[in-house]
């Protein structure tokens, strides 16, 4: 079983590391090509392209400039510990045991605009390059055209290595669009998280993102390997709703706190 999650815009390169083990990203030749394109952008162009403030554009121009091909614990940190968004608040990888990291390294993948696919312990230099950004490159008009089948092929390698054919899609639509479902050698299961608001259940972005992290943690902590085991997920008040679910979609609901 392979879990897919999105990266985060917020990064943490300060907190103490909970493991010293690391691996290197497997698609760095591709990353280097994107860095080459990104370095051509001025801070104002970055600001417009990414719809971010001038200050953030300056920070990210510096990140593109400072990026180097040699990754070490001095200039990079493990991806699962560097990302700090809502998904990662739910995941809480900073509390993982070494055995948890082992299982995650086999069964969890982070999709990335710059790195393509990251394993949890892959070192990552800081960046911001969302998958949906229209960064023109030698392969096309955006990052989806740049990555083409590369991400899907890498996921197929991971599935083959574990002798499995199930992908748990906990990534956002923006990121999962970089995967070619018809070329993926797997059944795709998508957990959906609905929160009650004024008597109606709906997707509330902040809660849904955190729940994706909670579900990832649930799978890792309990060493789950079969999709039917996911129905036992009950973190922070969520429960499985069989009536609302289908073969490819597992629906979890949570009542509003009264």
From Swiss-Prot:
InterPro entries: YaaA. One of its GO terms (biological process) is response to hydroperoxide. It holds the Pfam family H2O2_YaaD. GO terms for cellular component: cytosol. Belongs to the UPF0246 family. This is UPF0246 protein YaaA. The gene is yaaA.
